From Swiss-Prot:
Keyword terms of this UniProt record: ATP-binding, Nucleotide-binding, Plant defense, Repeat
PANTHER family in UniProt: DISEASE RESISTANCE PROTEIN RP, DISEASE RESISTANCE PROTEIN RPM1
Protein task: Possible disease resistance protein.
CDD domains in alphabetical order: Ras_like_GTPase
Span list, region Disordered: 36-84
Polar residues composition bias: residue spans: 41-70
GO process terms (BP): defense response
Protein name: Probable disease resistance protein At4g19060
Transmembrane segments: none
Domain NB-ARC: 75-184, 207-281
Origin organism lineage: Eukaryota, Viridiplantae, Streptophyta, Embryophyta, Tracheophyta
Length: 383
């Protein structure tokens, strides 16, 4: 398979330094995005010819936002709009990390202290998945309301929209605030600016700053008195939020994000980012930082790989697979593979994926295990 060979040849050598790791991971992303986009487009064209005007949706690969560039020149393919919904596959590992997050949220249930936490790590290491698992945890649901998930990247964001205003609007929409209110707030800001200009009053505050201040005030009013949990997923510099969320001295600055989060009611804000410097600027102390590293456990990475294999097995074949395990994907089956040399295969997967769960899932899509006619499971020789 040409796509698989090209993909694997790019990441076949072992990484020797942190800089090489970063470069190699970037190559994994760009190569897979380009090749998978071609394959996916061809597949959709074939599907359209078979099913008329039907279109297929729901593919969660990182290629769905591959067009265009961000304001600072980084390709949008690096960002994906996320949601609070649990992934459609089993979540492997994260036992200690999940316990840490739950402890952060639940250790002092009656505490009224406002707290922030940043989860930082490489692309594809599982920051979003970890947060989704905790966000949907029943114990967490019982303590926090409202719970709001904010994907810092949104496909719906207009090119001329101020990134700060866009994020606050999306939080307010989650709280039930309608777009009509946003129009009213913007009109108010424009009218106030116009009146002061006509009166000859010198003012440095722009219309957008006035609009942002009003939106943050509206957010504050909607959250005051509530034990809220807010997740800001995939924060980049492009979002232009780099201010301490718990800095009470900044509460007087009307355009500061912390103004929108009432203090003293036990609210919590969790953010994820690939940028540790930015994360520290937002959450402050080292103790508010949780680093997520690539997997060192070959067994859990192997399980992630097997779960992602796009194998569909009929009833007869499933009968032959006595140790097959059903996944959340309905008719998909994740077989337990017992290769002749398991240690070698698992280490090979670890080397090729760099310990990154997303890379392991990508490899599973282009180099899956196969089920032969008699129900035995084997690996493709080219892997």
């Amino acid at each position: 398979m040409d796509i698989a060979k090209k993909f694997i040849s790019e990441i076949d050598d072992k990484l020797e330094s942190k800089s090489e790791f970063d470069k190699e991971l970037e190559k994994i992303k760009s190569s897979f995005n380009e090749e998978y986009e071609k394959w996916s487009s061809g597949k959709q064209r074939g599907s359209s010819s078979k099913h008329g005007n039907q279109s297929t949706h729901g593919d969660s690969s990182p290629t769905r936002n591959s067009s265009g560039s961000s304001k600072k020149g980084r390709p949008k393919a690096n960002r994906v709009e996320t949601s609070s919904e649990l992934p459609d596959h089993l979540i492997r590992g994260f036992i200690n990390e999940k316990l840490f997050l739950k402890n952060f949220l639940l250790k002092q249930k009656e505490s009224e202290e406002f707290k922030t936490l940043a989860i930082v790590g490489k692309y594809g290491v599982g920051k979003t998945t970890l947060c989704q698992a905790v966000f949907n945890d029943e114990d967490v649901k019982q303590v926090y309301f409202p719970r709001i998930w904010v994907s810092m990247y949104s496909k719906e964001t207009k090119e001329d929209e101020d990134p700060k205003i866009d994020v606050v609007k999306r939080i307010l929409r989650s709280l039930g605030v309608e777009d009509e209110m946003f129009k009213h707030i913007k009109t108010e800001a424009e009218e106030e600016k116009s009146i002061k200009d006509e009166a000859g009053e010198r003012e440095e505050e722009t219309v957008k700053e006035k609009e942002l201040a009003r939106l943050l005030y509206a957010l504050h009013l909607n959250l005051i008195g509530k034990k809220y949990l807010i997740v800001l997923d995939d924060v980049w510099e492009d979002n232009e939020w780099d201010q301490r969320l718990d800095d009470e001295k900044k509460q007087q600055e009307k355009s500061h994000l912390s103004c929108g989060f009432p203090k003293g009611f036990g609210g919590k804000v969790i953010m994820t980012s690939r940028d540790e410097r930015l994360a520290k600027a937002i959450v402050g102390e080292e103790e508010n930082l949780q680093r997520l590293f690539p997997r060192s456990d070959a067994e859990s990475l192997w399980e992630i790989y097997i779960d992602a294999v796009p194998t569909k097995v009929d009833d007869a074949a499933a009968t032959n697979l006595g140790d097959a395990v059903a996944t959340n994907a309905g008719d998909a089956v994740a077989p337990k593979v017992n290769p002749r040399y398991p240690g070698r295969y698992k280490q090979e997967l670890m080397d090729k994926s760099c310990g990154i769960p997303l890379a392991a899932r990508m490899l599973a899509k282009i180099e899956p295990v196969k089920v032969d006619e008699i129900g035995n499971i084997d690996r493709k020789q080219s892997f």
